[in-house]
Regions:
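Transmembrane helix-boundary motif of multi-pass solute transporters/channels
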Residues: 14-54, 239, 250-253, 257-260, ...
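Membrane-interface "cap" regions at the ends of multi-pass membrane proteins
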Residues: 1-33, 62-67, 71-84, 88-92, ...
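Membrane-embedded translocation segments of transport machinery
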Residues: 3-8, 12, 170, 174-322, ...
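Helix-loop-helix connectors at the membrane interface of multi-pass transporters/channels
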Residues: 5, 79, 112-141, 242-245, ...
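Membrane-water interface regions at transmembrane-helix termini and the short interhelical loops
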Residues: 38-42, 68, 89-104, 137, ...
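Select transmembrane alpha-helical segments in multipass membrane proteins
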Residues: 11-22, 46-50, 88-102, 148-153, ...
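Inter-helical loop and helix-membrane interface segments of multi-pass membrane transporters/permeases
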Residues: 6-9, 38-42, 77-96, 109-166, ...
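A generic transmembrane alpha-helix motif of multi-pass inner-membrane proteins
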Residues: 373, 378-401, 425-458
Length: 458
């Protein structure tokens, strides 16, 4: 019976398909929208340095562990966890991993909708309009237009998933990722060559210990979850579509390099441009999530070729958002397929309904429903907090415990070294998965919850 189930499962065509799809999953709004504003806020170069160190240790370990578990079991998170025993704890660990993408994809698609709106306006030549004060807040508080943009983004994502792993995800990733790289280079060069931009390059690339604080580490850890799509059920799901002859270690290295390179490029696209525009004014650097939708249009409006830059930039952001939203949606769909024994069509429809329902709440949370607050947050911010700060650290701890206590690191090593494949960072992996990863995840969990309730300020 096992044999039959295995053969029916779809798969990536090979290493390139897997790497570009996994990199597509991990290169998303997290890299282009979240990374630069965190780097700007938490001290530039020192943040970047800590981020890279964490990606090579913590990030690497979690990617290897999740991919290996997916490939060993050939199942999405719930089934993968439950393959190792019947306990309630195991199935809870699986479900936490599985529910995260179901909650992220709706609000992610809302932000994707904002990106579509900005792109359309740039194509129409309305760059100056986008740069006007108050444009962004007026736009997001108008429920109808955000809802339409959100629906377009959500339906496009669902259409790709409907087409399947090879025809949908892999094909789109193979098309979009190379374009994404080229665009990020073009925009970074454009940004760095503006007058006054070099100060920004220096701030972003040169670590300055003066800017270091404990929060730099916590922020870099939180960003890594986002950025490498750890603890979202995605890598377990993608691992289950990965062929046995593809090296897990090599693929992980490729994904890490790809992901970190794009995050650095995004920093080079955004931070120097902000410096050129504002002369490194601390308030502009602290703009946070608004950096991409408020500051960047102002920067483009003040420079030559602003409209062209705006179009290229938002095409890039849109591609990054789509490659990630299809990974999140795939993860959700595969859970329903595996657990409810549904066909793909039915599972896509169910996920679509959830997406439109929860996403509409996030859209309306800035407009007609702005009076509703969950622990003082609007819907979108609340879903972001719940998934990124609470559930993902718990999911990561569950994965670490699964590997160290239930599956055993030996079995993971065997899976990674299947065939001719190497596992050079075996020692780092063992120490990280047993001790450091769960501790790091617990620190993120505790500090972000304490921050949300105002016990500490980050």
């Amino acid at each position: 019976r096992m044999k039959m189930e295995h053969n029916k499962r779809s798969s990536f065509s090979g290493k390139l398909g897997y790497v570009l799809s996994a990199a597509g999953a991990s290169v998303g709004l997290g890299n282009i929208w979240r990374f630069p504003y965190l780097a700007a806020k938490y001290g530039g170069g020192i943040f970047l340095l800590i981020y890279i160190l964490l990606a090579l240790t913590f990030g690497y370990t979690m990617i290897v562990a999740e991919t290996a578990i997916g490939r060993m079991t050939k199942k999405s998170p719930v089934g993968a966890f439950s393959s190792f025993g019947k306990s309630k704890w195991l199935s809870a660990g699986g479900w936490i991993n599985a529910i995260i993408p179901v909650l992220i994809v709706p609000y992610y698609s809302v932000i994707g909708g904002w990106v579509i709106k900005y792109l359309v306006e740039y194509v129409k030549g309305n760059g100056q309009k986008l740069a006007a004060d108050g444009y962004f807040s007026d736009f997001i508080s108008n429920g109808t237009s955000t809802e339409i943009c959100f629906a377009v983004f959500a339906l496009f994502t669902l259409a790709i998933i409907y087409a399947g792993v090879r025809n949908g995800i892999e094909r789109v990733s193979k098309f979009m990722m190379p374009i994404l790289i080229v665009l990020s280079v073009i925009i970074a060069v454009y940004s760095v060559t503006r007058p006054g931009a070099l100060e920004g390059v220096k701030y972003f690339l040169v670590p300055n210990v003066k800017n270091f604080s404990w929060m730099t580490v916590v922020a870099a850890m939180g960003q890594m979850f986002y950025s490498l799509s750890i603890a979202m059920g995605i890598l377990i799901t993608f691992g289950s579509y990965m062929k046995k002859d593809v090296s897990i270690e090599d693929s992980t290295r490729n994904v890490e390099v790809f992901d970190t390179a794009i995050a650095i490029m995004a920093g080079l696209m955004i931070i120097p441009a902000v410096f050129a525009f504002s002369g490194g004014d601390p308030d502009t650097l602290q703009a946070g999530p608004a950096l991409m939708f408020i500051t960047i249009p102002k920067v483009f409006a003040s420079m030559g070729f602003g409209t062209v830059a705006g179009i290229l930039f938002f095409v890039l952001v849109l591609f990054a958002a789509i490659t990630s939203s299809i990974a999140l949606t795939e993860s959700a769909v595969s859970t329903f397929e595996d657990e409810l024994h549904w066909g793909r069509k039915k599972a896509v429809v169910l996920v679509g309904v959830i997406m439109l329902g929860l996403g509409t709440l996030s859209c309306m949370g800035y407009g007609p429903l702005s009076w509703v607050k969950l622990i003082g947050m609007q819907f979108l911010d609340f879903f972001d907090f719940l998934t990124n700060s609470v559930m993902m650290p718990i999911a990561a701890i569950a994965t670490c415990l699964l590997v160290s206590k239930v599956v055993g690191t030996k079995s993971i090593e065997e899976e990674v070294m299947h065939g001719e494949s190497t596992f050079r960072r075996k020692k780092i992996f063992n120490v990280m998965i047993r001790y450091l990863c769960p501790i790091f995840a617990a620190i993120i969990l505790i500090s972000s919850v304490a921050n949300a309730f105002g016990w500490i300020s980050m």
